[in-house]
């Protein structure tokens, strides 16, 4: 766009010589002759007809001006108008000169004034040329994108719009012909209108009003002086007045308006310059687009909305918002409205019931499941199992892998029942012991799903998705799936943390059939690049492997977030070796009408594994004795000719693993360690070396990180150098051997002080129907007595409070039936608790204590009251102020001490469990901590101020928050009392419900 001209001196070209006297003299003579001719023609003009000069001929050139001077009358008017203009602008002439009536005198004065104006013009132009143009450009052209030349001679600007960068530079391009003052003014007006239009169009695109104005380009005349002389003769008009010869100076009024507009424009430009100085600028050199442009100042911040240049706070808010957007690194997934997406249909049902099974009735099928390692199936319309691979009617490409590569002559018990359920399109929960073939139970149906659908296009996402809790398990699953890729077009991508994400992104962009991933890394990939790397909209088959471990590691929020990205009609399969309560609750959320199958027993060691417990005496030489025993076991193992066998040794801590490796290496026993403290590349290297039969490393020292998902061929011996802390960990550790029907051996080291661990081992031996040593049984019985007295606490395992419930469900047919048909209702018990809560005075005065009501209108409340009558109910006294137990800046304003030492063991455990306290803390916004020391009921020790009885300290900022926490704790107590009552008064029930 062009820049409105406010200083006419800027429009001249300094490349032409202005001080040649000869040229100036010739031009003056030419001008005088022209004036004489015009004056003569004006005196002999016809009529009194007057015409106004045409001032809208900008850019028409000298040809249009000459045409306008054809009539004599117009020539006379222009001469008279020129005289009036010069006469009005002169500040040092008398009024008598301005009122001269003689045409000769007017002509003389006109020539004199023209000479003075020429000299003034020369002086002004010289001063402008010598001035520092970049500084003037900064003052007059202060817009966002401006190009400044550093040369002494400058070119007039030319419009050059760049939609990408919007950089405007000055160019050296003149037009041909001369332009007068009127053309200049009209071109200015035209340029302003054009600027206004462009500014309105571009205001939506960027913040800075920044289209740089530039001055109009005059058409080239003979030189600049000729332009000025011609402008004098063509820019002035003279109007005669019939009444008295009154002179009207319209041109002066127009020039004053233009000067006012120019001043206003300069003020606006100065305001914009002040705003732009507060914003970042970037300097760049632009030699490609304009040879005469040395420096280009660019403002490259583009906002979507136009800002108020008078409001600096508005600019700061926008900059802060943009900074916060850049700093927001949270991995948030886009919400998907599945109701608005029309997903393509897919087939789930592939299973055809074998003829042999279709002829069996339910009783015969139950007997068949009993023979298959006591398989139990719960749900509606459970498909019958199969017995041979041929009954599945799988493609030949799949059958060749099963029989030749995998070497499975017949399916395992869980495969016999799980594969028909999954191939029937049903959601399933599979609970089976480790090494029972769970992986193949979902790999075969997933492969069948993939074969029935088109290969995903790049960016569409996988058809099958397998989630695992650990990297090692993910790699093991990928290895099993890749065995089927040799006979079919199957592409698998294993995504896990600790590895290069760029390679995983490259594989996903090319397209894959299956993704095996850990939840955290999968969310990273789904959120990367705005969700354009991959999606889960094509996913129709989802597997959660080792689901119990996944939820114990805190992956539940990530899993729920992932499931929001998958189509609702997907098929979901969940496999686990244990099934705690919280896993059961989540299964109800993500599964639709599932079938639950249980093979063998939950947390039971496989019958193919022989178990041995070695008891040590607690002495100073305990570690040396254990190392010596381990060395003897390894020597005996390898001396028996099992040179190709592998040995896995479990320890409790990472430092113990490294120390044991150094000890064995000193004894010339090749070994390697793996634990969570090692990098992913070191862990992969350790597993690869241990799995390779030719590596020479047959001993692996590991923590419980290798207890799940590690499937190594010829792993014949597992040694627990340190015993596990809970039953599930023990089952998974020893489950690394004896896999796929092979025999294995497990040896565990314990000392006589590890009573808790010994009780776990004794329980595992009994559950697997193994003989128990009398010394071990004696220590276990001693520990159980301590538990009953409250001195010790039973291990909770992987949050495994649901294990006892599952065992009771399996043993009680009535509960199985109720849960299957949805008749089991917990509202009655909750209602009783609610009624009790409403009748109890929770918060009396500080000196009074709360107690259960003595009577109630309902039988349940009466029974609960009688049960609780023998229990000393703790008080809930809320005290205002800071508790003495808490120090530091986080003191609260209210607190309450609830003594739980004298509560029954079951009630006390139900309150202090981490999951229960976490829910109460989150709901009430308080802090709850366990303080004091446990004193058994028959203990002779007396509580002291330093060591009071076991109690809960509730702290909150408000009384209401502490009251809410106390109410929730009281409800937990009531639930515990109700559970005790049901256990004590439960009567035998029948199998059927009428």
UniProtKB/Swiss-Prot annotation:
UniProt keyword list: ATP-binding, Coiled coil, Helicase, Hydrolase, mRNA processing, mRNA splicing, Nucleotide-binding, Nucleus
Which regions are flagged for Low complexity bias? 845-867
Q: What class of enzyme is it?
A: hydrolase
Q: What is the lineage of its organism?
A: Eukaryota, Fungi, Dikarya, Ascomycota, Saccharomycotina
Q: What CDD domains would the database entry show? A: DEADc_DDX46 (cd17953), KH-I_PRP5_like (cd22474), SF2_C_DEAD (cd18787)
Gene Ontology CC:
nucleus
Q: What is the protein's given name?
A: Pre-mRNA-processing ATP-dependent RNA helicase PRP5
Q: List, as start-end ranges, the regions of compositional bias called Polar residues.
A: 1-18, 84-102, 235-245
